[in-house]
Amino acid sequence: MKPQFVGILLSSLLGAALGNRMRCYNCGGSPSSSCKEAVTTCGEGRPQPGLEQIKLPGNPPVTLIHQHPACVAAHHCNQVETESVGDVTYPAHRDCYLGDLCNSAVASHVAPAGILAAAATALTCLLPGLWSG
């Protein structure tokens, strides 16, 4: 095999392996901690947690929203569980975010788009050399 082809193949495999992992802000669970400064890379099968919506019964019913601070296992996503506080039971809906750094109020999608553009440019420059002999 040509060395250029092997390089492209290895780069593609590395990009695919790392490209599936997302980053999330790790707030540490503390309201005073700065989420913008602590970034964690979520492992495969561990998407970013989303908002937990807790609907409390009453007149009128109340919905509490809680944002989880870090990556979670995929089986915890999109779940509805029953939680109890004293004599009151209520449903808790847990969803997960999809996308890089999306557990923030301002999601960042520039990095993945930039990586794709750079990869497309590199392939455009390198592929003609493979067929030129």
Swiss-Prot record:
Species name: Homo sapiens (Human)
Domain of life of the native organism: Eukaryota
Cellular compartment(s): Cell membrane; Cell projection, Filopodium
InterPro entries, per database record: LY6_UPA_recep-like, LY6G6d/LY6G6f
Lipid-carrying residues in chain (GPI-anchor amidated serine): 104
Residue ranges annotated as propeptide in the record: 105-133
Name of the protein in question: Lymphocyte antigen 6 complex locus protein G6d
Segment forming the signal sequence: 1-19
